[in-house]
Amino acid sequence: MPKQQKKILITIDDGFESFYKEAWPYLKKNKIPFIIFISTKPVGKNGYMTWDQIKEIEKEDFVLIGHHSHTHDYLIDKTIEEFINDTEKASRIFLKNIGYVPSIYSYPFGECSKEMKDYITRNFDLSFGQHSGVIDVNKDKFELPRF
């Protein structure tokens, strides 16, 4: 694909069961690449995907699982220690259930403090906020925009 050709990236948050029932069959059939950001606390609860469903989609080579915290709380209101504890708890749960910790992070509600970003920068390969914009080589890879 020529470099100047425009590309898109599909990102999905939260791991809702409706994604698995409605969107997953289409994405799978057409092998459309995407990242799904999972918060670990709601997994298996009413309205959310189970770990078996997450493992099913994760095995496809066009799917990336992303880290989206444990609680999906509005973490910008938490202390840095609470943020780190929440993130590390999710990391342990990911390791137990899918065998690795995702290297891509999405801030719940798209916001982060400087301290949160510093922590994510040290522990992940890149991260997404939730502000509009295009991604190019000049973007900060730890505050990538998306709609």
Segment roles from a protein language model:
Residues 1-11, 17-21, 55-56, 60, ...:
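C-terminal active-site subregion of NodB/CE4 polysaccharide deacetylases
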Residues 11-12, 66:
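Generic enzyme active-site microenvironment
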Residues 24-32, 49-67, 121:
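Acidic (Asp/Glu)-rich catalytic clusters
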Residues 37-38, 66, 104-108:
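Short beta-strand segments
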Residues 38-43, 131-135:
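Short, acidic/turn-prone active-site loops that include or flank metal/cofactor-
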Residues 40-44, 74, 108-111:
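Short histidine/acidic/glycine/proline-rich micro-motifs that form metal-
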Residues 46-48, 76-78:
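Short, well-ordered secondary-structure micro-motifs
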Residues 68, 72:
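Histidine-centered divalent metal-coordination motifs
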